[in-house]
Each structure stands twice: as C-alpha cells, then as structure tokens.
C-alpha cells in the first residue's frame, strides 16, 4: 500500500492549509526475480514517482517497500547503502543524467568508486568490458557525453548502471527520448542484458507497444492509483478495466 504525497504550494499569498497532492495512493505489486514488471499510464499518473520511491529518491508517505523480504522504505541512508548498490536506474534523458565534465570512463567508474568496489585499475578494466557489452568501442571511454548521439548516451547510462553488478534496475522511460529507429535496439539490448546477468526490471513507460514486448506483467496506473494488473499478453487480449481499454484502443 505505497503512498507518496507532496505538499502543494498555494497560489494565494497567504494560506493556512496547503494542499496535498496524492502522487501515489495505496499501490501494491510485486516483481518476480529475473522478470520485468511494467508500469503504464498517462503523464502525471505517478509512474516515475513509484520508481523513485522504490529507489528511495522519494521517501514514502506510507506503506512499505520490501526488497528480498527486507523492508527498506523506512531505512536511513547508512542502512540503505548496500541496497543502493543492488538497485540501479536508467532514466529518460541520458544527457542530463551524465556529467558533461566527465569522460565516459569516469562516468562508468564512479559508482564502483562510491561503493568501494575493485581497485582503480580493475574499475577501468570493467569499464572496458561494459562499454563493449553495450555496443560501443573502448576508445569511446575517453570521450565526453556531448560527443555521442542520444542512443549512444543511453547505452553509456546502461553501462554505468551495470557497473556495480545490480540485481534490480528501474528503467524510467528509457527510450521515449530516442528516435523510433533506435528504440527497438535499446529494448533488445535490455532484454539481452537481462538474460546475460539475470536482471529484474521495473519498466516505466507510456508506450504500450513497447511495454507489451518487454514486460512479463503490467500494472496500469491512473492518477496515482493502480487500476489493473495482468500478464502482458492477457492485458492486451482481455483488458478488464475501462481505463485499460481506453489506453489500448488509443494505440
């Protein structure tokens, strides 16, 4: 029953009762290890807020978040550190999430340094391995983010996420900023990486065709509430909730 509420600033000069925005309200779901759970819904439905709450970028207002049976929703930052290594993210805009003053090598190595993994030399070797895994070249490690296309930058973001050997990755609209020609490539790569490393994904998107392709199970969100959960194929062949039917009919 996850809840994430935000206080809204009143447009009035003086107000004694600030409004409450219920970004996520009593949402419950689970993700099977090694599988992909999709969250779909229109803009403002609360999809990204849920992803950020799971990663603890937002502190939940209520409810619990369990990771392999351990409740992490109320943990302090020190307790969370080992879980931050296990849980990584890939966001919509790869350029804004990559430090423009750092080389690709520095970007990929930084999470490993934060979590005190490997020696500096081993980090560089791992960066070489990962840059090849995501389809780029070793010489790209010495370049800067502005020297790459959007699709290439997203590949760098994925390499960075993989650097600390995570088990769970939140993919928050990872392809929506890319050209259609590149979207299928990134989706296929995410599937290949899942099979290679045994990853578990939360895949957040408003693109229903993509979610159907990559996800095992899908939850449909509307204004912070979960309308329906079903296996991907079943959801598209036999949607039950009127809102789900409306979303699918708009494809």
Feature-to-residue mapping (PLM):
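The feature captures the beta-strand-to-loop junction immediately N-terminal to the Walker
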Residues: 40-41
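Conserved ABC transporter NBD signature motif
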Residues: 63-71
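P-loop NTP-binding/switch modules centered on Walker-like glycine-rich loops
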Residues: 174, 178, 182-251
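ABC ATPase NBD coupling module
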Residues: 13-17, 72-88, 114, 234-239
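Conserved ABC ATPase signature
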Residues: 144-148, 152
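Conserved ABC ATPase "signature" region
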Residues: 71, 122-139, 248-249
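A short, proline-enriched helix->beta-strand linker immediately N-terminal to the Walker B motif
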Residues: 163-167
